[in-house]
């Protein structure tokens, strides 16, 4: 009887180890996919942004990461749709950031 309990414990432990390894592999694959996507986004941004515009976007990313991510994704989509034909300079980047910031800005009103 004690041997049966040990066998059950051993099987259960092996099952748990197997599940853990499968989860770990799935997580590693997801991280690898995310890194690949991020590398592709950065490659596209290097192609369409001047160094000054990339620098501005990097500074915005430090302060407002959500806004910077949104701008990156919009620029990539526009590039893939063929709507960006020339490099975006710092002045254009300022306009883009201002437009997107205005669109996503939330107003807070306090009523008494």
UniProtKB/Swiss-Prot annotation:
Alphabetized UniProt keyword annotations: DNA-binding
Q: Name one GO molecular function term.
A: DNA binding
Is DNA-binding tagged as a keyword?
Answer: yes
List the GO cellular component terms: cytosol
**Pfam family for this entry, one:** dsDNA_bind
- Record's NCBIfam families? PRK04239.1
Q: Which PANTHER family match?
A: PROGRAMMED CELL DEATH PROTEIN 5 (PTHR10840:SF0)
Question: What family is this?
Answer: Belongs to the PDCD5 family.
Q: What is this protein called?
A: DNA-binding protein PF1087
Give the source species: Pyrococcus furiosus (strain ATCC 43587 / DSM 3638 / JCM 8422 / Vc1)
């Amino acid at each position: 009887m004690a041997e049966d309990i040990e066998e059950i414990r051993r099987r259960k432990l092996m099952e748990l180890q197997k599940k853990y390894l499968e989860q770990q592999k799935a997580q590693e694959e997801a991280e690898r996919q995310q890194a690949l996507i991020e590398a592709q986004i950065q490659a596209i941004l290097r192609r369409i942004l001047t160094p000054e515009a990339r620098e501005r976007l990097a500074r915005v990313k430090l302060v407002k990461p959500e806004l910077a991510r949104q701008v990156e994704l919009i620029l990539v989509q526009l590039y893939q749709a063929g709507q960006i034909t020339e490099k975006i300079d710092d002045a254009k980047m300022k306009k883009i950031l201002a437009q997107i910031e205005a669109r996503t800005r939330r107003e807070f009103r306090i009523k008494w």
